[in-house]
Structures are given as structure tokens and as C-alpha cells.
């Protein structure tokens, strides 16, 4: 249940209690069997489908508020739930249940000359705090992934999706209860006041082990600057698609249209198109024509405008903008070297793709660009944990510590060492 900011209890006290409950739930959850966790996940998926009408009604309240507040179309798209999206949420939870349990997996082992046998074993992180914007599906994905990895989780979604997230959370709790797991293993922050985020970033008195922010630049920047606990940063997706002179034009057209227009409001949508200057006269117009016919606004450099006058002039700001909308910035570059220079200058290190047939060109793209996900002859919209076979993702980490790329169940674990001896002493 969500509480307004003028509640009788102080927000710090409320959040401290949330942290205490999460910490208490984390201990039994860390040793829960795979069967228990999978039972909880499948029961949660059932509960979501059974509560379909309630979830849709809650979502209608959120959508009405978003319309009243004049939110952008891309924002409303991410907020919107329908029959198909609810089915997809349930399917994603079931897919997570089918994944191998990472907890207890021996990821390396070796013997020492003195007879000690050493094992590196996956363990839960503990309590994860997830702070995200108004995407109701993240409530389900994050809750399910953390559960599978044996972690308790505290979910703080955007206030604009409060009703939808609360309805989904209710179904997740039913899943926990069906498997006799602690209901506090998946909690939703019970207040909409932003001060609750500040309390989470302080760590709730040592209760939170890691924070995962999922949202725009301002949210992630705040988390990174204020957090007193480790952070898995999910930065904006300024994703690039480069069309090399060796590319198959038909393939390039299909990929460009999908990378930008399949869903414009997701972090894996292409925001900048780079075309090899050597094939601009033959490749640029067909590709941009497809995008324009699909309703995409083209913003191009002066060279692009000369070849495709229907484009609008691009500004310097465009090259570092995540549109999350039917807009794309377009530039011509001097082959793979020019593409690498442009991407390394403007990228958020999320996802980049190349369409090319030349193996050496592809090798340079893979070796010289330092982004979390690099694709060859495939759409940037495959930058997704589900598409990677992870079941779902809690976000796409763009940093370099611990987790990078799609954050699935394995990335939500740590490890410990088990050392077996037969009486050895160092002496």
C-alpha cells in the first residue's frame, strides 16, 4: 500500500523498517531450494494472469494521471500495459523459473600442492535496492530475477506507475506465500516521496548491499553521486548503427528500420546512424526513405542534408541525445576508422551495431569500441536479457565493475571460496 508524504511516521523510520524486513528475509531466501524459488515464480506468474483485470484497472489510473500531466508519448508507451504485455510479463517470470539456479554453482575449482582443494561458489548478494522510472514491467522482472538469485529486493518505481507496480507486487507476494518463502523478500517502497530514494542511497543502515538504478541520465547521476553502497549503473542508451561500405544494402535497410522503429522508447533503440561515406550515394537515400516512411524524423549533418534534403539539420547536442522517440541523427563517416572515432566520442557505452561483410572491418569494430554490447549484422534491439537467454534483465550495466551488459540472475550473485583440507597448517 502506498502512503502519502504527510504520513504520521517519519520517512526515515518507514524506510529503516523496510530495510530491516528485507535483511531478515534475505537470510532464509539465501538458502531456499531451487524448487521453492521456482514454485514461487510460477505461482507469481499465475497470480499476475489471475489479477489481469485489477492490473489493467490500476494501469488505467496511472495512464489517466500521465495524460493529465502531459507526459510524452514515449513515456506513456513505457507506462502502458495491455493484455499482450501482461501475458509477456507472466511468460518472462516463467522463463526465469526455467533458468539454472546460480546459487551454489561451483564456477572454478583447483587443487594446491599442499593438498587444499579450493572452490569458488556463487552466492546471493543479499539485499538489492532497485530504483527505476515508470515502467511497470520492471517491478515484475526485478522482483523475479532477484528471487531466482536468492536475493531480497526493495523496489522503488516512479510515482507515475505507482498503481500498476503495486498491483503487480501484490501478485509477486502471492507467489512467495505459495512457496512458504518470506513475503518481505520482495518489498515495494510504501511511500511516493522522493526522500525515500535518498534513504535507500544511504543503504538503510547497512541493509542494502547494492543499488541498481534503471532510468534516465538524471536518475543515474543522482544515484552515482549520492549512493553509499555499490551501484550497478544503467546509463542511457545512445546506441549507434554503422553501415559499412561492405554491407549488404537490403540487410542494412532491414536492420536500420528495426533498430530504430521496432520500439523507439527502449534503451536498445538506435539513436544515431552512421553511413560509410564511400557508399553514401547508393545506401543513404534508401535507408532514410524507409525510416521516414515509418514515421521517423531524420536529423542529419550538412553532408546528409545535401544527399537527403528532407532531413532536418542536426545540432551538436543531437549526437549525444537519447531520443526514446521516432527521431534519429545521421552522419557520414570515413569508413570504420571514422565510425570508431564518432562512437567512442559520443557513445554512452551501451550498445553499438555494425552492418558489414568484411571480416577485418568487423574485427576492428569489436576490438576498438568499448561498449557493453556490440552486434554484427543484427539490430541493436537485441540488447536485451531475454534475447540473450537470460530470461529477463534487471537492467543493462554500462560500467565495468562486477556486472556489464544485461544484468540477469548470474550477475545478481557474488561468490565465496570453500577450502577443503585434511589437517593442513601453515606452520
Swiss-Prot record:
Listed SUPFAM superfamilies: ALDH-like
KW rRNA processing (keyword) present: no
Protein's UniProt keywords contain Amino-acid biosynthesis: yes
EC number(s) from the headed UniProt entry: 1.2.1.41
Pfam families assigned to the protein according to its UniProt record, in alphabetical order: Aldedh
Record keywords: Amino-acid biosynthesis, Cytoplasm, NADP, Oxidoreductase, Proline biosynthesis
Cellular location(s): Cytoplasm
Role: Catalyzes the NADPH-dependent reduction of L-glutamate 5-phosphate into L-glutamate 5-semialdehyde and phosphate. The product spontaneously undergoes cyclization to form 1-pyrroline-5-carboxylate.
Family affiliation: Belongs to the gamma-glutamyl phosphate reductase family.
Protein name from the UniProt record: Gamma-glutamyl phosphate reductase
